[in-house]
Structures are given as C-alpha cells and as structure tokens.
Design a protein with these regions (language model features):
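Compact, glycine-rich, soluble single-domain proteins
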Residues: 1-47
C-alpha cells in the first residue's frame, strides 16, 4: 500500500508498508531544492 500525504509547509510524507519516507523540499532560490529522506531505522540522507 502506497500512501502519499502532504504535511504543512513543503514536506511530503510517502508511506510504503511500514516504511515512511519524508521528503522536505526547501526552495533556496531558482533551481535549488533540499530533499530529506528519513527511514525508520534512523538513516537520513540529505542531498
């Protein structure tokens, strides 16, 4: 089951089974965005 939910602000929560991915998009300027992925096991990848 895939659940896509938009939180307050520019963050989107994607839930696949028991795995939750939080995608936070922050526009710092033209062409700049920050994506944050958070997994239940505590690994966070920022790009």
């Amino acid at each position: 089951m895939l659940v896509l939910r938009r939180n307050e602000g520019q963050s989107v929560v994607i839930t696949v089974g028991d795995v939750r991915i939080v995608v936070a998009v922050t526009l710092l300027g033209p062409g700049w965005a920050k994506l944050g992925f958070s997994a239940p096991h505590g690994v966070t990848i920022n790009r």
